[in-house]
Amino acid sequence: MELPHRQCLGRVLIVTAALLSPAFTVLGNDILGLKVAGEPVLTPNAVCLRLAGLTKKQMRLCVRSPDVTASALQGIQVAIHECQHQLRDQRWNCSSLENHGKLPHQSAILNRGFRESAFSLSLLAAGVVHSVASACSLGKLRGCGCEAKRRLDDDKIRLKLTQLQLQTFQRSGVSLAGAGENTPELSSLHGSLPANLHSSHPMSLLKPLPDEVTMLQDTWEWGGCSHDIRFGVRFSRDWLDSRGSPRDIHARTRIHNNRVGRQVVTDNMRRKCKCHGTSGSCQFKTCWYVSPEFRLVGSLLREKFLTAIFINSQNKNNGVFNSRTGGSTGSDPLRGQRRRSISRELVYFEKSPDFCDREPAVDSLGTQGRICNKSSPGMDGCGSLCCGRGHNILKQARSERCHCRFHWCCYVLCEECKVTEWVNVCK
């Protein structure tokens, strides 16, 4: 059997997010069908008027913040790619979401109550939060960011380093009068010292370190530019939760699952730190919050997908959910374990179809032609994936995107690789 062989054929630009075409053959960004070079100018005409299917509220949001909308669309495309990765071994593998352009919420499956619907909605909501919050921290959006805060933090860092240096000299018995002359690192590596440090009373500026701090390396404080997760959550909520009546079961489960997706991002924010000091030392650190890697977000939501709760709606039209006894696995999903809080779990209210055959009404492309693993007993095995129809063994040569990197805004730079391999294909 011939081993897979990859040959890089060259770089191609794969347009995502605010792009209309998946092919990109010119230098610059093809933003919504407009050929522009360099950083795009995202205006309401360039973004909003080319998006079909927007609600009135979404159109108002887009006109007010076209740059944030473009970032949200990029997050949606990232989420679709992650959805395809996480459900690659399932009969429904998110591929149909790509067929609905920039707004997959028009997809039939996202307007149903399946387990797959819940997972997809939560991942799309998480993608919007992640993309918008990250763009904010990079200063790419007019409505948020912290460039001014960065400059203020730089001044604070220089002052803090100076204080720590002077305290070091004080503890070492070095004359403060000669410290400024003998330590060029203070000015050469960290910019000019604040003017008031050259006064005749530098001791007045020193703030003694706490007694429990015995080493300068233990000193850290908040700084840098944290991802504006609150702004991302707010825009995701305003953008995605605005469809349908809140009393409709479809809308209520959608809003619930959107919230679960956003919560996974906020719950997994992590602290990132940077060292500051002379000559490569780490005299103290500034730290800020960053969003989790989106692969982690996808993996955590997949776990929730596998344990999603089957619910029914009370007939009181008051928005309350009840978990049903018995799920799609044929047994009570809560039996033998502590009852879970439904607020952090994905919920669904319709039993999923088998997705074996093409069925546009539920966005099923079927599994004919899908590659399966004949040695796997799982969902990706030929027995399950091919729905009992059997499989063929074929030698396949294909091209695929590889080594992709997302760039602001709004494209993905990929290499195109050629793959030749023997595969098992569902009949």
Curated annotation (Swiss-Prot):
Domain of life according to the entry: Eukaryota
GO cellular component terms attached to this protein's record: extracellular space
Disulfide-bond pairs as recorded: 83-94, 136-144, 146-225, 273-287, 275-282, 356-387, 372-382, 386-426, 402-417, 404-414, 409-410
Glycosites: 93, 373
Tissue expression summary: In the embryo, expressed in the developing central nervous system (CNS), with an expression pattern very similar to that of wnt1.
Signal peptide: 1-28
Ranges that cross the membrane: none
SMART domains per UniProt: WNT1
InterPro entries: Wnt (IPR005817), Wnt_C (IPR043158), Wnt_CS (IPR018161)
Family (UniProt): Belongs to the Wnt family.
Name this protein carries in UniProt: Protein Wnt-10b
